[in-house]
Amino acid sequence: MKEYQIHLELDRSQQHNFLYPLLFREYIYTLAHDHGLNRSTIPLENGGYDNKSSSLSVKRLISRTYQRIHLSIYAKDSNPNQFIGHNNQFYSQMISEGFSVIVEIPFSLRLVAFLEGKEKEMAKSHNFQSIHSIFPFFENNFSHLHYVLDVLIPYPIRPEILVRAFRYWVKDASSLHLLRFFLHEYFNWNSLITPKKSNSIFSTSNPRFFLFLYNSHVYEYESIFFFLRNQSSHLRSTSSGLLFERISFYGKVEDLVQVFVNDFQDNLWLFKHPIMHYVRYQGKSVLASKDMPLLMNKWKYYLVNLWQWHFHVWSQPGRIHINHLYKDYINFLGYLSRGRLNTLVVRSQMLENAFLIDNAMKQFETTVPIIPLIGSLTMARFCNSLGHPISKPTWADSSDSYIIDRFMRICRKLSHYHSGSSKKKSLYRIKYILRVSCVKSLVRKHKSTVRVFLKRLGSEFLEEFFTEEEHVLSLIFPRALFTSRRLYRGRVWYLDIICINDFVNHDKFEIVPN
């Protein structure tokens, strides 16, 4: 075990000491024009942010903050350590956003170095950056499996755990102190990682810092799996891949090496199952195996011990579920997925004798979760808790074209995202709710009734709510109208979707604290 720890420390040896001079010295111009970042053609995870968060702006803000502190010292006897105050929220927010940019530099440099010389491979696999590419992976690899481990990755509720994980990769005492300061100032520890419920300025106004900390924590969690798999060369997997996308990276790893450690101290056993798949997006991961309930229970025990002893997080029983793929649904990326056995009857005749043969065809089914979607529409004030459409009073002062365009965009995005559903009936119901809500919003604005309003505009009003997706497919296949209609009734995965829809993301990064 000590030998593995030594190798792990060597793998983490690429540490940087430039955060302190970057913040408080004049070397900022050198790093701001670093050739390694500028020459990269790989789209990094959090690229394209506002120039207000640039490192040069942060340096100027720090200088202005120190000037204000010195002036306050000469003006009156005040405490210069009161950095975050009611009047200084703008300065603290700007510095924290700039700090997020700065701490991403070493990880971006490592990513550029790792992907150097692989631009052609990344260009070929550009479509795999889409989160919809996960579902064809499910269809190709999960249809012959039986058991699924549904895992909700916990998040540490103590700030020192985050600082300790970050300390493995960045060797700079000043930046660690600054990170600890931001964590203690901004986090509401009673509702950690619940930005939609927390009143914290950090969680609502600095999502970049939040995503960086979350991804670094998950990266630390997953690095143990990949490190032990690479070290066990005699059990090396046949194929593996790591794919990056713009929100958070996920991995599709085949033939994982199973690692079971007893209290992470004494003994280490390595064994491998020939059919094992792992997929993760944000805080939820799926581990699938074929007809091995004992193996899945060992994985569950291993994960609980990993969280408890390495991350000091007490795992609740509801975070890990062992489900049968053909009996239970997998709630992943806004879809309910499971395996399904379809019986196909084949008539075979030999001379004068005829036989009926039942063939069980295994398929992977994806459906729309109608109840969570109605809950999201209820929170957005498009319908009530029973799914009955209501008007949108906040848009009553807008023009008719604006109201119709807003409803059409929402309906188009939901149809686009749920185009891979096996059953379109639930999607039709969502479209109906949005259509009637749009009509009621217009009726409320014009102080009329639904019957009079539709009679004046005609029965063909807002038919695009139901024909928009079919129209898009007809543009893709202009010479085959029948093909486009058949695809519309079937499942279509769009590989240009790189993030989950707000109405689909029912959790929205929410992880209940332990």
UniProtKB/Swiss-Prot annotation:
Main location: plastid
GO CC list: chloroplast
Pfam families documented for this protein: Intron_maturas2, MatK_N
Subcellular location: Plastid, Chloroplast
GO aspect biological process, one term: tRNA processing
GO MF term (any one): RNA binding
Superkingdom classification of source: Eukaryota
UniProt entry keywords in alphabetical sequence: Chloroplast, mRNA processing, Plastid, RNA-binding, tRNA processing
Protein role: Usually encoded in the trnK tRNA gene intron. Probably assists in splicing its own and other chloroplast group II introns.
HAMAP family: MatK (MF_01390)
PANTHER family: MATURASE K (PTHR34811:SF1)
Family: Belongs to the intron maturase 2 family. MatK subfamily.
Protein name, entry field: Maturase K
Organism: Acer palmatum (Japanese maple)
